């Protein structure tokens, strides 16, 4: 009985309160409508009043505004503001260090060591001087690496792109952050050498890959100055460029890359290191300039231009670099 009565009393109380509230709301309906109309009127009239009062105040007080502007632009006011700013910066709570250039310079890079690997012929395409030139263009984090290892050689591994992809994949597993330098020699009598630097290991893919750190390069052996002087007629821009001489002012140098002339190994010097090809295709023993005359190699790089992102594109049948 007691539990049942306790359950009935709240329902009766709630019903009574709802009826009383409905009667009260019915009696207060006109007042609510009046307050709503007043709030709507003030909502539309307040912005207009604010704008009109602002314009009136600006038009009726021109002297005060001009005086305030003069005071703000006065030399004394500027000097006080500067003193306050200096005092705030030199306060003991704020420490402003004095920065000067460090007299210490980073140490020079250690010489490169080219490791051809077993079963590779003594005569190779890459010289140490050419490798040092390529090293200056690779990312700074990889310039500290002083040992370059041969991953693939046409003479040792055969003409197979799948073998090239496989060997580069093995190197990427051992060194995930390694870079890759591609060296190619054409079949022309001059034996020009060209190649590229690749940020990623070459592998078959359906899309372009690589970053803006990739670049192309080429190197060629320059003829001796005596041969250049014997050429009759005006010298072309290509001959001037190969000789290491500056181009004429009329030449288009908009897309000119990095060019360097460097001295290669001596002719006929077979020390077992990676060496550059000879310009005449011979061994250099019967060269007219003598066996001790060093070669001059023309190096030119073509960095990322920013036009597109077509860096590397490889498939099972071809390898493309700088497609854009």
From Swiss-Prot:
Where does it live in the cell?
Answer: Mitochondrion
Known SMART domains for this protein? TLDc
Task: State where composition is biased (Polar residues).
Answer: 251-263
List compositional bias (Low complexity) regions by residue number: 9-29
One of the GO BP terms on file: response to oxidative stress
The terms describing its cellular component in GO are: mitochondrion; nucleus
Renumbered to this chain, region (Disordered) spans 1-35, 63-113, 244-292
Q: Does the keyword rRNA processing apply?
A: no
| InterPro entries associated with the record | TLDc_dom (IPR006571)
Provide an example Pfam family for this protein.
TLD
Domain TLDc, chain residue ranges per copy? 124-324
**Which N-terminal residues, if any, form the signal peptide?**
none
Its domain of life reads Eukaryota
Keywords, A to Z, come to: Mitochondrion
Predominant location category: mitochondrion
What family does this belong to? Belongs to the OXR1 family.
**The protein's role, per its UniProt record:** May be involved in protection from oxidative damage.
Put simply, this protein is called Oxidation resistance protein 1
